[in-house]
Amino acid sequence: MTTILDLLGKDADYLLNHQCIIKKEALTLPSGDFVSRVFAESDRNNRVLRSLQQMFDHGRLGGSGYLSILPVDQGVEHTAGASFAKNPMYFDPENIVRLAIESGCSAVASSYGVLSILARRYAHKIPFLLKLNHNELLSYPTTYHQIFFSQVEDAYNMGAVAVGATVYFGSESSNEEIVSVAKAFSRARELGLATVLWCYLRNPHFTRNGVDYHTAADLTGQADHLGATLGADIVKQKLPTLQEGFKTINFSKTDDLVYSELSSNHPIDLCRYQVLNSYCGKVGLINSGGPSSGQNDFTEAAKTAVINKRAGGMGLILGRKAFQRPFSEGVQLLNLIQDIYLDPTISIS
């Protein structure tokens, strides 16, 4: 049987024994009583606290303070053909929800169409997270603009416990998206729903000399900070891969201490800088799993989970690596990352 150490390979010591520049004592870390410790002191009403607790109590990670969410909104974001051609069973929304249930996920996140058509059968069996806005890829030339496909009331009526939305920070449409998401999240809180923000960057100028800074820790960290400012209970972010986006692109403001005293080039330090920007962990950071690369998916997923956990993150929201493979293997992959969060020997750095 392949172990986590086998999957980490030569990177095992590098990832499992690293000590972060920012000490964990400076952070609010995930735990079974996270909702009571953090959000009970906030302005969230009792119904929001209950909704959050439902996600934290559900699935294999229930009671741990960590989340394993299956997101399948790629049929809109990346087109259904590109997303499901490798595994056509997922054109049927029921198999999406079945995968989340059978793999013991904390919640399933998807579009209004997917969740609404199954709500009466499954909303009481697994927490629903309704993704409110999307970027559709049927416009030509391709544009990037998150528009609302559904409303907060739709989530409430179908029995969802949470809503999600994306803001493309740095894009031409970001100001409009910020305003619309702020209104939606305010309404969600009134109705007792938890809120998750996809804090993504989108700007052609964020690529310089062939290097893509959309995953720079300083830029993504600021996006997380803006997401927390919008009142998100949880922020979703891509795993950072490099640093010094602000300095290289030469825009906005930063400080040399960000790079010398608050982070390093180690992936766990880069991710910890994201956690730092998420109100020192008071707003949970979940990282995305990224695209499927085929045979390396298990190794990549294991490394991502180890980095997120050891950095002080709250879990993974992983989709394509799980559903773009046979059903049983998808369950196995999701269980793998859950095992990492449940493993007491993989400690927070």
Swiss-Prot record:
Pfam families: DeoC (PF01791). SUPFAM superfamilies: Aldolase (SSF51569). One of its GO terms (biological process) is glycolytic process. It catalyses: beta-D-fructose 1,6-bisphosphate = D-glyceraldehyde 3-phosphate + dihydroxyacetone phosphate. Signal peptide: none annotated. Its main location: cytoplasm. CDD domains: DhnA. The active site is at K236. It is found in: Cytoplasm. SMART domains: DeoC. Its EC number is 4.1.2.13. One of its GO terms (cellular component) is cytoplasm. GO terms for molecular function: fructose-bisphosphate aldolase activity. Keywords: Cytoplasm, Glycolysis, Lyase, Schiff base. Belongs to the DeoC/FbaB aldolase family. FbaB subfamily. This is Probable fructose-bisphosphate aldolase class 1.
